[in-house]
UniProtKB/Swiss-Prot annotation:
The chain crosses the membrane at residues 39-59, 67-87. This is Protein OPG096. Keywords: Early protein, Host cytoplasm, Host endoplasmic reticulum, Host membrane, Membrane, Transmembrane, Transmembrane helix, Virion. Belongs to the orthopoxvirus OPG096 family. The keyword Thylakoid does not apply. Induction: Expressed in the early phase of the viral replicative cycle. It is a multi-pass membrane protein. Interacts with OPG158. Signal peptide: none annotated. GO terms for cellular component: host cell endoplasmic reticulum membrane; membrane; virion membrane. It is found in: Virion membrane; Host cytoplasm; Host endoplasmic reticulum membrane. Early protein involved in virion morphogenesis. Participates in the formation and elongation of crescent-shaped membrane precursors of immature virions in cytoplasmic factories. The keyword Transmembrane helix applies. The gene is OPG096. The lineage of its organism: Viruses, Varidnaviria, Bamfordvirae, Nucleocytoviricota, Pokkesviricetes.
Amino acid sequence: MEVIADRLDDIVKQNIADEKFVDFVIHGLEHQCPAILRPLIRLFIDILLFVIVIYIFTVRLVSRNYQMLLALLALVISLTIFYYFIL
């Protein structure tokens, strides 16, 4: 159990270091642009990071649960066919 706790502590420390690095890069990009464009650059970077995170979680979800997702898709298709052709 102690090994897992140590590993989690290492992950938290690495995430904090990564976040500081990303903030440093974003800060550098913001100050290269005119002041009027800084909020737009900040918004663009935040949207880009959000899309990357959503993509990573979607790939993980599909790769780990593709059988259940295929069964769910088959159920939806069969219910749709039942609704349109039988009723």
